[in-house]
Amino acid sequence: MSDTQHSCVIIGIAGASASGKSLIAQTIYEELVAELGAGQIGVITEDCYYRDQTHLTMEERVKTNYDHPNALDHDLLVQHLSQLVQGDAVNIPQYSYTEHTRMSEVTPFAPRRVIILEGILLLTDSRLRDLMDASIFMDTPLDICLLRRLVRDVQERGRTMDSVLKQYQKTVRPMFLQFIEPSKQYADVIVPRGGKNRIAIDMLKARIRHMLIG
């Protein structure tokens, strides 16, 4: 983590699916908006960069291993972050969890003073790590992550409990052990107890303020 002043601060939040990444990202976002203003901070989700699969049938899309780094278009994410650092706006893809592919719509995203980047595989890519000014890893027990994922995917993403459990056993847990957990070594800060860890939130906010003022 650098101590120099930054025109754009990028904070990376990684960890298992349903480990609390989105919660801590949203909490930091909402609290910093009150200090910096709505146009000064934004959140980018790695999920938006799942590859376009419109050329595949639905049956083929369902079989994709979404917990493997190859499922994500990190080339485009690196390109977009580099453009934002340079002061250029980008169009972020939108991804449909029900259609398992990108949508035709995009989300315009203007340069911000602070960008919070959250996703399961962010720390597996050295190019993304090099763009981050600070990175954290949500170190939440897998059994808790599974319970949260069941509730989220059934209630919010139209999944069945059986399909969620099968995916967890087939790809989610194995890919966590192969890719996500080993990437913890690259994190500047490891956060236990999920996204409601108040000490971690306050520490990250203080770090962001420090980098903004130099």
From Swiss-Prot:
TM stretches of this protein: none
Pfam short name (any one): PRK
Subcellular location: Cytoplasm
Superkingdom as given in the UniProt entry: Bacteria
Family statement: Belongs to the uridine kinase family.
UniProt-listed PANTHER family: URIDINE KINASE (PTHR10285)
Protein name: Uridine kinase
Source organism of the structure: Aeromonas hydrophila subsp. hydrophila (strain ATCC 7966 / DSM 30187 / BCRC 13018 / CCUG 14551 / JCM 1027 / KCTC 2358 / NCIMB 9240 / NCTC 8049)
Lineage, highest ranks first: Bacteria, Pseudomonadati, Pseudomonadota, Gammaproteobacteria, Aeromonadales
